[in-house]
């Protein structure tokens, strides 16, 4: 589960390497974000020459979480790290490449561009 002050790895080539969660979108009392949820975050580490800089406030969608997620068939999926992909206001990714696997649950939330860019969908 991702909440305020959670640090996530960035799984794209937008220039950010690590982000810190400011807010979970989707209601005033919403505390946790899971796979496919949108968060507002600030960039804590960035690569030189990237599109985003350290200190920028960005929107991101969570693509991997350490906490396990239950699927409809009864199976569970979890990852080794918490990761997100930076998105624009129209839900399209800021970067042109996605690193690492992403969860199949993104398909339910209409993130087809992220699914198509990902090297592996679990």
Swiss-Prot record:
InterPro entries (UniProt xref): Ribosomal_uL14 (IPR000218), Ribosomal_uL14_bac-type (IPR005745), Ribosomal_uL14_CS (IPR019972), Ribosomal_uL14_sf (IPR036853)
CDD domains found in the cross-reference section: Ribosomal_uL14
Originating gene: rplN
GO molecular-function term, one example from the UniProt record: structural constituent of ribosome
GO cellular component: cytosolic large ribosomal subunit
One Gene Ontology term from the biological process aspect of the record: translation
Family to which this protein belongs: Belongs to the universal ribosomal protein uL14 family.
Role according to the record: Binds to 23S rRNA. Forms part of two intersubunit bridges in the 70S ribosome.
Superkingdom of origin organism: Bacteria
Protein name listed in UniProt: Large ribosomal subunit protein uL14
Keyword Membrane: no
């Amino acid at each position: 589960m991702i909440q305020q002050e959670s640090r996530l790895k960035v799984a794209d080539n937008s220039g950010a390497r690590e982000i810190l969660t400011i807010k979970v979108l989707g209601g005033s009392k919403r505390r946790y974000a899971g796979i496919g949820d949108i968060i507002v975050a600030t960039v804590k580490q960035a690569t030189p020459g990237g599109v985003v800089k350290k200190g920028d406030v960005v929107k991101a969608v969570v693509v991997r979480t350490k906490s396990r997620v239950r699927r409809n068939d009864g199976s569970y999926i979890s990852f080794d790290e918490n990761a997100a992909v930076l998105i624009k206001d129209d839900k399209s990714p800021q970067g042109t490449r996605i690193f690492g696997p992403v969860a199949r649950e993104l398909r339910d939330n209409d993130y087809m561009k992220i699914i198509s860019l990902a090297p592996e969908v679990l």
